[in-house]
């Protein structure tokens, strides 16, 4: 019994220290809840008539997730933060998650214009240029 307690304590300490090694302020960090199915806004973009409210809601959600840089162009694959293969891979992963969130917050009838864009920034720019 004492051995099991010692093992559990050591496992918990190990897990805690590995979690502390993540920089939660790093825009490349993805929390477990930040998966492709996460919802950015309750109202999908349907067109010009709700673009302003939709865009504001999406921006606020992304600010809360520390991911606004993926749509405003400040966090790109060529930015100074991407200085290693690991960072580049993390950027690709995070950018694809953000792109998926945006696609999932848009009415399916509008998917044709954005589905083949490569980055979240390209998707955002296409929607902004089309509807704002």
State each model region's role.
Residues 1-132:
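N-terminal Lys/Arg-enriched interaction segments
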């Amino acid at each position: 019994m004492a051995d099991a307690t010692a093992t559990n304590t050591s496992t918990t300490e190990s897990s805690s220290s590995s979690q502390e090694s993540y920089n939660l302020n790093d825009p490349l960090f993805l929390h477990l809840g930040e998966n492709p199915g996460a919802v950015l806004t309750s109202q999908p973009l349907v067109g010009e008539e709700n673009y302003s409210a939709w865009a504001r809601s999406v921006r606020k959600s992304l600010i809360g997730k520390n991911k606004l840089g993926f749509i405003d162009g400040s966090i790109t694959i060529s930015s100074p933060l991407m200085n290693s293969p690991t960072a580049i891979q993390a950027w690709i992963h995070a950018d694809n998650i953000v792109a998926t969130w945006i696609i999932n917050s848009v009415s399916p009838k509008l998917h044709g214009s954005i589905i083949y864009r490569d980055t979240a920034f390209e998707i955002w720019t296409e929607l902004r240029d089309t509807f704002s």
